[in-house]
């Protein structure tokens, strides 16, 4: 297994927290100790297929385009460190019970991401459309049968100026982005 079971607390198949004792053993959190929080089941390697052919569509730009992961890699890349934290981190300490995994302090990590800066992607598409206000990313999660996607779709929108500091990441801590962490490609802002 690629996760250290002794360092993790399993809340559900889509929610795994890191034990407090396993946080801070190094500046960068090893992948084996990084929490997992997903709304939908993780895509399998067979669903993803050849990662280099994975496609992403860029809209809200002057010349909308679809890029393969291989094409994105040709645009250039950078590596940056960020704090990755679930917005529900600490909810287990609330005086009143709230929905979701009862995270304590283990839904946080320091991660090195490698990918293409969104600025390079936007430039390759002729710049941002003048009507654009936000940058939004959405995955292609496959909803389980019977689930209403309108109730389960998760999108994150940020002001469009953030695109200059964002990236489409394909590596996490020097290895291909694991499926459970959004692989083969995820937005990092």
Residue locations for each model-derived region?
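Structured, non-membrane catalytic/scaffold regions adjacent to prosthetic-group chemistry
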Residues: 1-189
